[in-house]
UniProtKB/Swiss-Prot annotation:
This is Thymidylate kinase. One of its GO terms (biological process) is dTTP biosynthetic process. Its EC number is 2.7.4.9. The gene is tmk. Keywords: ATP-binding, Kinase, Nucleotide biosynthesis, Nucleotide-binding, Transferase. HAMAP family: Thymidylate_kinase. Pfam families: Thymidylate_kin (PF02223). It comes from Streptococcus pneumoniae (strain Taiwan19F-14). Phosphorylation of dTMP to form dTDP in both de novo and salvage pathways of dTTP synthesis.
């Protein structure tokens, strides 16, 4: 690649983004692709500290605007410190969540003004958008059931939210898919992991112009 390529992974809780990414990494490395994987919120020291505040199960009184601004602050630091240097070095950067999460969770989920969220995203990223977004879609109930069955997963504040919020979040993602279908590709995350990985690989390789 002559320049970096930015991919974001999005989806409701329990969609299995992390498992797919773990399976993809060795495939990409075999192709000789330099890959940086990272996550939001987090990715760098300041971002990880903000992540702890956001996801702490005891912070149930957190205001929706406070939550949004914490995500935005983490996003900016993460971008400047880690993502942009990797892109400038010509790497493939795969982010577990990015700008669309704010629209889906704080916009549709929390009911905050989406134009304001778009402005904050623009401000924090200087207009940077992913070259490709992979949206892993799954029915809310199935995703939450996966989380409940995963004893290794630490419970966070968002896991304690009611079903209604998670349904609004999924609707937000589907709305984004309708609006930005040229950038966002929907992947059926309810299928067996092997099939999801194969579909993801195909979409990613097409987007990057790599031979399969």
């Amino acid at each position: 690649m002559s320049k970096g390529f930015l991919v974001s992974l999005e989806g409701p809780e329990g969609a299995g983004k992390t498992s797919v990414l773990e399976a993809l990494l060795p495939i990409l490395e075999e192709k000789g692709v330099e890959v940086l994987t990272t996550r939001e919120p987090g990715g760098v020291l300041i971002g990880e500290k903000i992540r702890e505040v956001i996801l702490d199960p005891s912070h149930t009184q957190m205001d929706a605007k406070t939550e949004l601004l914490l995500y935005i602050a983490s996003r900016r630091q993460h971008l400047v410190e880690k993502v942009l240097p990797a892109l400038e070095a010509g790497k493939l950067v795969i982010m577990d969540r990015f700008i669309d999460s704010s629209v889906a969770y704080q916009g549709f989920g929390r009911g905050l003004d989406i134009e304001a969220i778009d402005w904050l995203n623009q401000f924090a990223t200087d207009g940077l958008k992913p070259d490709l977004t992979l949206y892993f879609d799954i029915e809310v109930e199935e995703g939450l059931a996966r989380i409940a069955a995963n004893s290794d997963r630490e419970v966070n504040r968002l896991d304690l939210e009611g079903l209604d919020l998670h349904k609004k979040v999924r609707q937000g993602y589907l709305s984004l898919l309708d609006k930005e279908g040229n950038r966002i590709v929907k992947i059926d995350a309810s299928l067996p992991l092997e099939q999801v990985v194969e579909t993801t690989k195909s979409v990613l390789f097409d987007g990057m112009g790599l031979a399969k």
